[in-house]
Curated annotation (Swiss-Prot):
Calcium-activated chloride channel (CaCC) which may play a role in olfactory signal transduction. Odorant molecules bind to odor-sensing receptors (OSRs), leading to an increase in calcium entry that activates CaCC current which amplifies the depolarization of the OSR cells, ANO2 seems to be the underlying chloride channel involved in this process. May mediate light perception amplification in retina. Keywords: Calcium, Cell membrane, Chloride, Chloride channel, Glycoprotein, Ion channel, Ion transport, Membrane, Transmembrane, Transmembrane helix, Transport. It comes from Mus musculus. The keyword Translocase does not apply. Residues 60-69 have a biased composition (Basic and acidic residues). Glycosylated. This is Anoctamin-2.
Length: 1002
């Protein structure tokens, strides 16, 4: 059944024949040929007869008399392939029609056995009406094929109908014979000019017109500055044609067959680039129906039902081919997808041309994000160096390291731990100052403004790219892309109708197009989706609870391991370092494992919801995956930053878990140093292992596995296997493109590491920058060399990812405010310096933060056994703001505690509002649309109107010239006839002087 609305479409320009369901001929089924072969009409000269109207014997004689034969790409080289050499491996075998898209499927037959001939001569292709010589039964080289099983037969019939409907839409197909017992078949699709023109007009694709104009750079100063920058950055520019003339731009206008005179069509075969051609074919594939496959709509449904294995556009040749032959893929590899060109800018225009706007915007965003990491990395290094430079001048660190200050500290554990001097923690205190100093407050404010400036500049770059890439007015295309329902959604609707109405509902569904029937019974309501929503809610809560449980398990590991190591005198001195390092590594391994699990769970939960369109599916998948991975990655960090050491208790009244294990507490210098260690290991580990090793190693392992599988797979010997493979074979062996969600997700999580806890780890932007320099080339190499070519998708922005980035930027302000106020000692130092210090300095700050405890009040069985402390201890110190034992309310929170707590809350409020105000101010000061782009858009609209009117005037003028010439010839003939009769006319007064005159002589 042909697709609705696509009947009676001329297949080729100038062809009088209309393609209908009867014109698709089938190959004869001889006694030894059980497979039907699809014949597709090919190029014919005007007046050429259609073979479909001839008798089969006449067809056979006509085909046998042809000079050329279209052969299989694996045919024996002894048979001459064609009178012409192959132009490229991206064309049909007639060397004329370009392969715009490829459908691949795997077939299997039973009971096949070879005839008497060599299998190398048994292959032929019936392609677009041009065939090789007919092989009659009993001839050498025949392949006797057994019957297909029921499932394979059903799939074959569905493929035949779908391919017939594609031809009814005007596409031209070429496919190979299923000559072996099993194997892969590639259906090559070519879109002729009239199909490209029709679909381009339907999709409103903007194409360049004849008119070009210069993009002005602004005033003279701006021009000079731009010229200087271009000269200085010339070594960093990729050597691609797009950068040679970037000051000129074509006016673009939606394609219209009635206004062909507007466009600069020099050659129809190359007017639409490869990405646009494949995009047009993909649109046809998505809306072509197949009634045998339960009236499913589109190629995605057929792939989901295993009718086809894959569908993909071809790459532009090989990226590592020898010689000087250049194509866009090879150019991208040389100037972008190699680690040796890491210092160069990205050829964004060429990326967009080859992969489409969606992938082009991703790499543009990644490039801008990486470039913005440079100033933040410089400031972060300066902050770190400031901490290094001022470490000798830090008064609290000097007091802690001073052995004359006899601060006898309470035991860190029960029984086995002894009293200890605070000066033994000198190294921890000095290291904490590297990250806990006044400069980190400034850096937190800077990073909050940095995030705002990054998002604002991205909006500006997005508008600039939208102008150069003609993405204005793309909303209609996005709405059209949402019209196609997902195969799973159609299946659920069909199951619903089957349950409600039985066979009558199925008949109704087959009689009406799924796109046209909008009744409630033909779509899923909230009642149908409620079980899925309930499952989603319960599963997400379970996953979050699982993450928290694992974090708690690691906490228990830290507590029990610390207690066990404290029993041994040899390991007692390194307990804190050992426990911290091993716990962070465990956290990292768990995060990496759960990341993979949560990604699969998020996809499964989204499928349960049964979203209608691909865009809705992608948005819901992104939200679920981000929520689960965010909780997974940051839960251990949130624990160290805000909860560790807050529920320890005090000497004599410690908090215990599992009846004997004390809750862990922070180091004497605070938890900020441990937070820094946790952040650095998790961030670097994720980037090194997950983002790089997995991305490099896993594809290589998959490729090796496929290669070993192909070598060990049983099958018939193929004598042509040593021949150079075709491009569709090479692309089929690549990994399928699965979307940009993993690429964005890893960068968004990294963005969170850079912004959320930057107050505790100012070097995070440096490590992110180093990772991204590699990440850009790693992703580029993956897209160019390891993935099948994605379908070109037009989009004007990065979608929901921008909202997530904006949310993280706002959330980071709150998190950094609490890190500075709660985790660091910045606020206690300010309170002491301006409220309790006698001389306005930090002298005496350490003593101010330590409380007294009477050791005689320790619980029975918790005192140190065999204490070797060199002096008798009456009072020990612990870090907290509590009343001394001799106070009326011993061990209660002191007045200093409430003063510090009030100052911390006040700082959070002031910091948050100040940074938010500055962020809004920066947002207001930086316009979303650059002024020059706004002016150029207005100018382009004016130029387009002028150009359109001028071309219309020229068209009318050219159309009027033949009429004027014909009218002028008639006037001259009439004047000559009047001149011949003039003498007699003038002798008669009152006669008409001329036949063309409307006046009389009176």
């Amino acid at each position: 059944m042909a697709a609705p609305g696509l009947r009676d479409i001329p297949l080729l320009p100038g062809s009088p024949r209309r393609l209908s369901s009867r014109t698709v001929a089938r190959g004869s089924q001889g006694p030894k040929h059980g497979q039907q072969y699809l014949k597709v009409p090919g190029h014919r000269a005007p007046g050429q007869r259609d073979n479909s109207s001839l008798h089969p014997s006449q067809v056979s004689r006509r085909e046998s008399s042809r000079d050329r034969s279209v052969i299989n790409n694996y045919l024996d080289a002894n048979e001459p392939p064609s009178s012409e050499a192959r132009l490229s491996r991206m064309h049909f075998h007639d060397n004329q029609r370009k392969v715009d898209y490829v459908l691949a499927y795997h077939y299997r037959k039973r009971g096949a056995h070879l005839g008497h001939g060599s299998p190398g001569h048994s292959l032929a292709v019936i392609s677009n009406g041009e065939t090789g010589k007919e092989r009659h039964g009993g001839g050498p080289g025949d392949v006797e094929l057994g019957p297909l099983d029921a499932l394979e037969e059903e799939r074959r019939e569905q493929r035949d109908e779908f391919e017939h409907n594609l031809m009814a839409a005007g596409l031209e197909l070429e496919k190979d014979l299923e000559s072996k017992s099993q194997g892969s078949v590639f259906v090559r699709i070519h879109a002729p000019w009239q199909v490209l023109a029709r679909e381009a007009e339907f999709l409103k694709i903007k194409v360049p017109t004849k008119k070009m104009y210069e993009i002005k750079a602004g005033g003279s100063i701006a021009k000079k500055f731009s010229a200087i920058l271009q000269t200085l950055s010339s070594p960093l520019q990729p050597r691609v044609p797009e950068h040679s003339n970037n000051r000129m731009k074509n006016l673009s206008y939606p394609f219209s067959r009635e206004k062909m005179y507007l466009y600069n069509i020099q050659e129809k075969d190359t007017f639409f680039d490869n990405a646009t051609r494949s995009r047009i074919v993909h649109e046809i594939l998505k809306r072509t129906a197949c009634s045998r496959a339960n009236n499913t709509m589109g190629i995605n449904s057929l792939i989901a039902n295993n009718i086809y294995e894959a569908a993909y556009p071809l790459h532009d040749g090989e990226y590592d081919s020898p010689g000087d032959d250049m194509n866009d893929r090879k150019l991208l590899y040389q100037e972008w997808a190699r680690y040796g060109v890491f210092y160069k800018f990205q050829p964004i225009d060429l990326i967009r041309k080859y992969f489409g706007e969606k992938i082009g915007l991703y790499f543009a965003w990644l490039g801008l994000y990486t470039s913005f990491l440079i100033p933040s990395s410089v400031i972060g290094v300066i902050v770190f160096l400031y901490g290094c430079a001022t470490i000798e001048e830090d008064i609290p660190s000097k007091e802690m390291c001073d052995h004359q200050n006899a601060f006898t500290m309470c035991p860190l554990c029960d029984k086995s731990c002894d009293y200890w001097n605070l000066s033994s923690a000198c190294g921890t205190a000095r290291a904490s100052h590297l990250f806990d100093n006044p400069a980190t407050v400034f850096f937190s404010i800077f990073m909050a403004l940095w995030a705002t400036m990054f998002l604002e500049n991205w909006k500006r770059l997005q508008m600039r790219l939208g102008y150069f890439w003609d993405l204005t007015g793309i909303e209609e295309e996005e709405e059209r892309s949402q019209e196609h329902s997902r195969p799973e959604y159609e299946t659920k609707v069909r199951e619903k109708l089957l349950k409600e109405s039985g066979k009558s509902a199925v008949q109704k569904l087959e009689a009406n197009s799924p796109e046209d029937d909008e009744d409630d019974e033909d779509k899923l309501t909230w009642k149908d989706r409620f079980p899925g929503y309930l499952m989603n809610f319960a599963s997400i809560l379970f996953m979050i609870a699982l993450t928290f449980s694992i974090v708690f398990g690691v906490i228990v590991y830290r507590i029990t391991t610390a207690a066990a190591l404290s029993l041994n005198k040899a390991t007692r001195s390194n307990v804190r370092v050992t426990v911290t390092a091993t716990a962070v590594i465990i956290n990292l391994v768990v995060i990496l494992i759960l990341d993979e699990i949560y990604g699969a769970v998020a996809k499964w939960l989204t499928k349960i919801e049964v979203p209608k369109t691909e865009q809705t599916f992608e948005e819901r998948l992104i939200l679920k995956a981000f929520l689960l991975k965010f909780v997974n990655a940051y839960s251990p960090i949130f624990y160290v930053a805000f909860f560790k050491g807050r529920f320890v208790g005090r000497p004599g009244s410690y908090v215990y878990v599992f009846d004997g294990y004390r809750m862990e507490e922070c180091a004497p210098g605070g938890c900020l140093m441990e937070l820094c260690i946790q952040l650095s290991i998790i961030m670097l580990g994720k980037q090194l292992i997950q983002n790089n090793i997995f991305e490099i190693g896993v594809p290589k392992l998959k490729k090796l596995f496929r290669k070993l599988k192909d070598e060990t797979e049983p099958g018939e010997s193929d004598p042509d296997h040593s021949k150079r493979p075709e491009q569709w074979d090479l692309d089929h062996s690549l990994e399928p493109y699965t979307g940009l969600t993993p690429e964005y997700m890893e960068m968004i999580i990294q963005f969170g590491f850079v912004t959320l806890f930057v107050a505790s780890f100012p070097l995070a932007p440096v490590f992110a920058l180093l990772n991204n320099v590699i990440e850009v080339r790693l992703d580029a190499k993956k897209f160019v060399t390891e993935l099948r070519r994605p379908d070109a998708v037009r989009t004007k922005d990065i979608g929901i990812w921008f909202d997530i980035l904006s949310g993280i930027g706002k959330f980071s302000v709150i998190i950094n405010a609490f890190v500075i106020a709660v985790t660091s000692d910045f606020i206690p130092r300010l309170v002491y310096q301006y409220s309790y210090s006698h001389n306005g300095t930090l002298h005496g700050f350490v003593n101010h933060t330590l409380s007294f405890f009477n050791v005689s009040q320790l619980k029975e069985g918790t005192q140190p056994e065999n204490s070797q402390f060199d002096q008798e201890v009456q009072f020990c110190r612990f870090k907290d703001y509590r009343e001394p034992p001799w106070a009326p309310n011993p061990y209660e929170f002191s007045k200093q505690y409430w003063s510090v707590l009030s100052a911390r809350l006040a700082f959070v409020i002031i910091f948050q509002n100040l940074v938010m105000f500055l962020s809004v101010l920066v947002d207001w000061m930086i316009p979303d649309i650059p002024t020059d782009i706004s002016d150029q858009i207005k100018k382009e609209k004016s130029l387009l109107v002028d150009f359109f009117l001028k071309e219309e005037h020229e068209k009318v003028k050219l159309a009027d010239e033949p009429t004027q010439r014909s009218q002028g010839g008639g006037d001259r003939s009439r004047r000559s006839r009047a001149a011949s009769s003039a003498p007699s006319g003038r002798s008669q007064p009152g006669s008409i002087a001329s036949s063309g005159s409307q006046h009389t002589n009176v």
